[in-house]
Amino acid sequence: MGRLLNQIKEPNDIKRISPKLYPVLAEEIRDFLLNNVSQTGGHLASNLGAVEITMALHICLRFPEDKVVYDVGHQSYVHKILTGRKDEFSTLRQKDGLCGFPKRSESECDVFGTGHSSTSISAALGLAVARDLEQKDNTVVAVIGDGALSGGMAYEALNNLSILRKEKKNMIIILNDNKMSISENVGGMSRYLNDLRSRKSYSEFKENVESALNNIPGVGKSVARTLKKSKDSIKQLFIPGMLFENMGITYYGLVNGHDIYELIHAINRAKQHEGPILIHAITRKGMGYKNAEKNPEKFHGIGPFDRKSGELLARKTKKTYTDVFADSLVALAKNNKKIVAITAAMPSGTGLKSFKKYYPKRFFDVGIAEEHAVTFAAGLAAQGMHPVFAVYSSFLQRGYDQVLHDVCIQKLPVFFCIDRSGLVGADGETHQGIFDISYLGHIPNMVLMAPKNGREMPEMMKFALEYNGPIAMKYPRGSVYEGLSEYNAPVELGKSEVIHEGQDVVILSVGSIMEECEKAVQHLQEKGYNPGLVNVRFIRPMDEDLLRELAAKYPLIVTVEENELIGGYGQMVSAFLHKNKYHNDLLSLGISDYFVRHATVAQQREQAGIDADSIAKSIIDRMN
C-alpha cells in the first residue's frame, strides 16, 4: 500500500495530505484499485476514471456531514477507500464482504444506496430539501455520468430542481463525462455533450469577456451590463441549446476531470453558489491503466484478471445463455425481415452486438430508457414488426407500467428476452433477477417461458417469434446447463415437459434451476425415493392439464424457482390446487422474502435452500 494512502484510515483524513502530493495520492489509489480488483473482480474502469473527482470532493467537503450521491454507484470504490474501508477491499463483492455499491448499512458516509441508473439527482434533491427544511447548511452533491443522463428520471429531477433556484438554495451536480455508460453512449444528449466538449470552457470564456469589457475606458462597463442582460442569446450562440442553464441550473465547465487542483477550485466555487449548479468534468474511463483505457467496455465490470496482460484468469470455456440468445437471434433474423432488436444502452451485456453487426438498420439502442424501450417496441409491433427487447431482469422492472399498459392490454407481439434472471452473484441486491415471475406472471395476455438448458432456448425463441402476442423468456447469467439434452419435446404453448416419472413426490422445476433439481432427484433416488421431475417451461399459461394429472398421482408436489416466493410460480400452483379443491401437500422452494446480498450464485442458492442438497433435504424432511 502507498505511503500516503496508508495515512488515510478515517473519513476526512485526506485533508492532512499536503496539496502538492495530491497527484501522488491519486497514483497510489489507482495502484490500490488495480491490485485489489484484479484479484476480486469488480467495476474497474469507471473507478479509475473517477479518482480525482472523488478526491476533490473529500478534500472540499466534510463527511458524513456533507452528502454525496453516486449515480449507479459502481464508481464509489474511491469513496469507500477514503472513508476508512480500504482494509476490507480483499472482500469486495464476496459473501459477507464489502459491497460493490454504496450501502447505507455499511457506512454513514454512504448517504444513499444506488445500483440502477439516473437516480442520483432525485435523491440528492430530496436530501437538499430536507436539509433546508431543517435549516442546516451542509453541502449536497450528485455525481452522475453522461450515460445516466440518457435516462428519463434524470430529466424529471433536473426539471424539479427549479424549486432550489427559486429559494436560492445550493445543490451541486458533477457531470462525470467520459463519453460512455457501459458501452458508448447514444442519442441526442450524447451529441449535445460531444458538442460541448469541442468548445472552449464556457465559464472561462464568460469571465474573460466580462473582464476585458470592464477594462475598456468609458464604454466597457456599459457594454458589459448590456452583455449580461442579453446573456441568454450569447450563451445560445456559443453553447448550442444551453440545456442546463435553460432549466435553471448554472453551468460550470469544461473542467479537466483529472486535474485535482482545477476540480478543487470548481467545487469550492460551486459551494458558494446560490441555487443548483452543474460542474461539467471531462474524464477518461480506465484512466491510468492502458488496458482499460484501450478497452473500457471490457473493464467496466470484470472478473479477476492478470494485471500485466489484462487477461481474465478464468477463461470462458462454455457458451453462456447470452451467447446462445445472440447466435439464435441472428440466425432467426436472416429469414424474418420483421425482426428488430432493441437494447437500453447494453448491446454487449445483452448479446446484441452481433445482431447490430449483421443487421444495423434493424438494431436500436435507445439509451438508458427502459420505459421508452418498451413502448417504442409496442409501436413497432403495432405496425407489423416483431420487436425483441433484450434487457436485464432487474432493469425491466423500470418498464412495468409500459409492459402492462402499452403491450399487454393491446396484445402486441413484443418479445421480451430477460437476461440475468434469477440469482446473479456478486452484484448483489440491486441486480438480482428474482422478481420477474412476480411482476410479469399476473399480467393478462402475457406468456412467460423459461428454458431448462441451452438446447431448449433456441426452440423457445423460434416459438416466441411465431407467436402473435406479448411473450417473455427468462434466462440466467452464466454458462448454459448442458444436461438433459436428450429431452427435447416440441415447444407448445402452455405445455410442460415430463423428464422423469415417479411415485412419491414430483418436482416442478422452473428454468435453469433444473441443473440443481436433476441432482436432487439423483440424491433422492440414492436414498430409496422415487421422485418425478417436470420441466415447467411455461410459467404462464400454466399447464393445467398436467397439473391435474400430477395432483391425482403424487401426494407431494414441490416447486423450485429462482424467484421471490411471494407472487412466484409456487403460489400460482397453490392457487390452482386450492381453486380446484385438490388437497395435495405442496412445498414451494425459492427466495423467501428477503433481498439477496452479494456472494457467488452457489452460495446464494445454498442460502435460499435451492441447491441440490438443500432441495433433497427439504423433500425428505417434508415426507417424514
Question: Where are the model-predicted features located?
Answer:
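N-terminal amphipathic, basic-rich helices that act as targeting or association modules
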Residues: 1-81, 245, 249-263, 280-283
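Long, well-ordered, tryptophan-enriched scaffold segments
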Residues: 4-5, 178-325
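Non-catalytic terminal/interface segments that mediate subunit docking, oligomerization
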Residues: 67, 283-397, 402-412, 469, ...
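Peripheral docking tails and interdomain loops at the edges
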Residues: 304-308, 312-317, 425-427, 446-447, ...
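A glycine-rich helix N-cap at a beta->alpha junction
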Residues: 88-98, 163-178, 201-204, 408-420
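Glycine-/acidic-rich phosphate or pyrophosphate-binding loops and their flanking alpha/beta elements
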Residues: 265-268, 300-301, 320-335, 351-357, ...
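Structural signature of the thiamine diphosphate
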Residues: 223-291, 413-418, 437-486, 612-624
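Cofactor-binding active-site loop characterized by glycine-rich and histidine/acidic residues
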Residues: 43-167, 321, 339, 343-344, ...
